[in-house]
């Protein structure tokens, strides 16, 4: 690796260790010419799969679009940004775990609904109403009835964030 101080090609690794999350390697390097030390980080380059829309068009996966959709559903809801970011990370990991170069937008939507159902019932219903294109109040009622029939412990876990805000 080229030295950022003098541009020499002769650098050596002095120390290597894993980052806290275990997804990066931190390396201390020393230049053979100027003896300066510097740190580099090495991580796997993971390419998110492309998203195939319902009309057949394809577009790159965009984390900011995922975040915007979730935040829109969670607007004015008592869910911490840390929990939202953790949900986004879980969705991205699940998409990568498919091992596919392309995924249907339907799969992304299902992953989002799954995460929102764990975060906040109101946000889940908001997202589901748009995602599944609810056309009448009965469709809302079906989803709400299903949520109400879940054991209280699941609902309590999802709503625990309300008191953390």
UniProtKB/Swiss-Prot annotation:
Disulfide connectivity? none
Q: Where are the zinc fingers (unnamed)?
A: 3-34
- Name any Gene Ontology BP term: negative regulation of DNA-templated transcription
- Details of cofactor binding: Binds 1 zinc ion.
Q: One Pfam annotation, family name?
A: Zn_ribbon_NrdR
Record flagged with keyword Metal-binding: yes
User: Where are the coiled-coil regions?
Assistant: none
Domain of life per record: Bacteria
A GO MF label: DNA binding
What cofactors does this protein use?
Zn(2+)
Q: Which UniProt keywords apply?
A: ATP-binding, DNA-binding, Metal-binding, Nucleotide-binding, Repressor, Transcription, Transcription regulation, Zinc, Zinc-finger
Question: Could you tell me which InterPro entries the record lists for this protein?
Answer: ATP-cone_dom (IPR005144), NrdR-like_N (IPR055173), RNR_NrdR-like (IPR003796)
* Domain ATP-cone: from-to ranges: 49-139
Q: What does this protein do?
A: Negatively regulates transcription of bacterial ribonucleotide reductase nrd genes and operons by binding to NrdR-boxes.
> NCBIfam families from the xrefs?
transcriptional regulator NrdR (TIGR00244)
User: Could you say which protein family the record assigns here?
Assistant: Belongs to the NrdR family.
Q: What is this protein called?
A: Transcriptional repressor NrdR
Source organism: Methylococcus capsulatus (strain ATCC 33009 / NCIMB 11132 / Bath)
The gene that this protein is the product of is nrdR
């Amino acid at each position: 690796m080229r030295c950022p101080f003098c541009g020499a090609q002769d650098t050596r690794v002095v120390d290597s260790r894993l980052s806290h999350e275990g997804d990066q390697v931190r390396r201390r390097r020393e230049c053979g010419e100027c003896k300066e030390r510097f740190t580099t980080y090495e991580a796997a380059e993971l390419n998110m799969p492309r998203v195939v829309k319902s009309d057949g068009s394809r577009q790159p996966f965009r984390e900011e679009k995922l975040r915007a959709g979730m935040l829109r559903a969670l607007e004015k809801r008592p869910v911490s940004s840390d929990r939202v970011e953790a949900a986004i990370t879980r969705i991205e990991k699940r998409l990568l775990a498919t091992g596919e170069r392309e995924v249907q937008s339907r799969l992304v939507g299902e992953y989002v609904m799954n995460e929102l159902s764990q975060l906040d019932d109101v946000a889940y219903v908001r997202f589901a109403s748009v995602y599944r294109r609810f056309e009448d109040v009965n469709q809302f009622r079906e989803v709400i009835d299903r949520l109400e029939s879940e054991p209280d412990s699941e609902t309590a876990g999802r709503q625990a964030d309300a008191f953390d805000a």
